[in-house]
Amino acid sequence: MEAWLAKPELLSADADAEYAEIIEIDLADVKEPVLCAPNDPDDARLLSSVQGEKIDEVFIGSCMTNIGHFRAAGKLLDKVKGGIPTRLWLSPPTKMDAHQLTEEGYYGIYGKAGARMEMPGCSLCMGNQARVAANSTVVSTSTRNFPNRLGDGANVYLASAELAAVASILGKLPTVEEYMAYAKDIDSMAGDIYRYLSFDQIADFREAAANAKIPVVQA
């Protein structure tokens, strides 16, 4: 662990790993965003087939997000004049992300937009900290959208954080052209937005880790 922390690398499969199935997707063939329609995570749809759907609430959070997604949402929200037409929930996946986003001024942007900030963690994904309004139509970045999971009778689309942010601003699922205009804006700032975060980059978290007392349970 100490060696990995000194030189962290993303995990990768062994060269001789065996798989039940290999599915190859040419990303050049993907011309528009893909969502999962209510209320089945296996019901994948192209954005163009569901565009225009009115959206009541948006959740950006869960373990599917990282700090870059919240920066991207913040950049888009910062350009909005006045309030947004949806109820927006934001829940960074870790306290570390929340700390850094606060330091970078994003929490002020979220507050100005009227977003509801949840404690870092699962939040709406499991419906165990709060729930969306009954029978609302929602865009969520979570991993599952089973019936009644996020709220009673809620219709939940699963989408990327960037698409979710756009939906929160427009109050609907955007057209492909509308989304691409926002995406172009995000892409122009990608180098600043999509910087991954590790706790060893923050002094407070590094100190806490160094002084952590981990009990050892002996059989």
What are these regions (language model features)?
Residues M1-A219:
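Fe-S-dependent hydro-lyases/dehydratases of central metabolism
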